Design a protein with these regions (language model features):
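Positively charged, low-complexity intrinsically disordered leader regions
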Residues: 1-41
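Short, glycine-rich nucleotide/cofactor-binding loops
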Residues: 19-23, 41-62
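Fold-independent oxyanion-binding glycine-rich loops
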Residues: 46-48, 83-84, 102-104
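Histidine-anchored nucleotide/phosphate-binding helix
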Residues: 57-75
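Class I S-adenosyl-L-methionine
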Residues: 69-72, 91, 95
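Short internal beta-strands
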Residues: 77-83
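Short, charged/polar "capping" segments at the starts of alpha-helices
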Residues: 85-91
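A glycine-rich helix N-cap at a beta->alpha junction
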Residues: 94-106
Length: 106
């Protein structure tokens, strides 16, 4: 039977699975316990400018917002951190969560 960790790494296109040998077998379960046992404020970094591509990333912000929405439902205060290129987009989809501009790229 596949674990959630197996499913996550099944379509690994960025070689993240090479880190698996350095992680606990149940890394998703351990991460969820860590989150649930530490309520409060969460910072989620997303939407950074890709120098080689000449544009802001587009796949990260929607997933980051979904994660933030789930954490809001669990009572967490969520802040998104992004650069000036992605800030308007992240603000547009982030509902009531605060977006902090971080000068990662000039």
């Amino acid at each position: 039977m596949k674990t959630i960790e197996d499913i996550i790494l099944d379509f690994d296109q960025r070689n993240i699975s090479s880190l698996r040998k350095h992680l606990p077998t149940n890394f998703c379960g351990e991460a969820s316990h860590l989150i649930l046992e530490n309520p409060g404020t969460v910072l989620i970094a997303t939407g950074f400018y890709i120098l080689a591509g000449g544009a802001a990333e587009t796949d990260g912000p929607p997933g980051a917002i979904a994660l933030g929405d789930a954490l809001n439902l669990l009572g967490y205060k969520v802040f998104y951190i992004t650069d000036r290129y992605s800030k308007p987009f992240v603000e547009a989809i982030s509902k009531d969560n605060k977006v902090i501009e971080f000068p990662i790229c000039s």
